[in-house]
Amino acid sequence: MNTPLHLENIKQAPKALLHDHLDGGLRPATVLDIAGQVGYDRLPATDVESLETWFRTASHSGSLERYLEPFSHTVAVMQTPEALHRVAYECVEDLAADSVVYAEVRFAPELHIDEGLSFDEVLASVLAGFADGERACAAEGNAITVRCLVTAMRHAAMSREIAELAIRFRDKGVVGFDIAGAEAGHPPTRHLDAFEYMRSNNARFTIHAGEAFGLPSIHEAIAFCGADRLGHGVRIVDDIDVDPGGGIRLGPLASILRDKRIPLELCPSSNLQTGAVASITEHPFDLLAWARFRVTVNTDNRLMSDTSMSLEMHRLVEAFGYGWGDLERFTINAMKSAFIPFDQRLAIIDEVIKPRFAVLVG
């Protein structure tokens, strides 16, 4: 007999997470604690509950640009090796507690050099935090694998340097590269040099595209930049026509995205907050899943969106009536799309994900 699809049961399901920002997932208590240690006095609240509420309400803005504003506070308390290590360590703990068995967590080193750290020092501190967190969770019987995506900000001019950083650390926990930030006015083709460098080194990358700006951003990311995955990509729905009888017709961009099995790192709650969708029930996740796009479930920013992988899955279950088989398919989609080697992906699918879902399905 199937285990009921309640939130508490979903928390027991194994999960694979591809799109999660380190600076968007801090514990409010940690933000307050580090702010006190480093003398940062610009926080909008002085107690945990009020600060948590502020992050959530400030981020629920209806636009991507306003959604990004609260990050100034989290980034401000992530400027020392100790703070970076702590935030990374706690990230691993929090994901493992939510039954995430594999995660790729991304962050932009260029945002963490205000106090004089080098890019290498910033990245080494985060990777050490991930590794120490993995060991601690494994010792408690809660194994998780966490790898890093190094992000460049699309409005800046450091993407080639950040891509080189990703390659320097490719054997130390970094599995790929990304660009992020406001899409409007900052097309991905401005960073072709970085993407060409990654390809020339046989390395993988994802691109934030189609979150707020629409089809042109997705087209550039795929046709000119050669993205292996799309961060969000939700606006691909603009290239899909649904006829009155329920059939669909894919435009050329949607067709190649589906045909090439390019993964979509979909983040439903975040899309609601930024105004990309009006409600979870109106999110195109279900249409894309039904049309057999490579859809994956992601958190984006756990603090700002007040979410977790379990909550994202539960919201989708409530909105679209998904069953355990659907959640397993989305999880395997994510694991297939991870940037670690094929044999490692297969091992996690066959030895962890499928057996644990089998218990839940009954």
From Swiss-Prot:
Cofactor note: Binds 1 zinc ion per subunit.
Claim: Zinc is one of the keywords in the record: yes
GO BP term (any one): hypoxanthine salvage
A single MF term (Gene Ontology): 2'-deoxyadenosine deaminase activity
Binding site for Zn(2+): H19, H21, H208, D300
GO cellular component labels: cytosol
Site, as annotated: Important for catalytic activity: H232
Record field: catalytic activity: adenosine + H2O + H(+) = inosine + NH4(+); 2'-deoxyadenosine + H2O + H(+) = 2'-deoxyinosine + NH4(+)
Binding site residues for substrate: H21, D23, G181
Top EC class of this enzyme: hydrolase
Requisite cofactors: Zn(2+)
Swiss-Prot/TrEMBL keywords: Hydrolase, Metal-binding, Nucleotide metabolism, Zinc
Active site: E211
Pfam families (UniProt xref): A_deaminase
Keyword Ribosomal protein attributed: no
Gene3D superfamilies per record: Metal-dependent hydrolases (3.20.20.140)
Family: Belongs to the metallo-dependent hydrolases superfamily. Adenosine and AMP deaminases family. Adenosine deaminase subfamily.
Task of the protein: Catalyzes the hydrolytic deamination of adenosine and 2-deoxyadenosine.
PANTHER family: ADENOSINE DEAMINASE
Protein name listed in UniProt: Adenosine deaminase
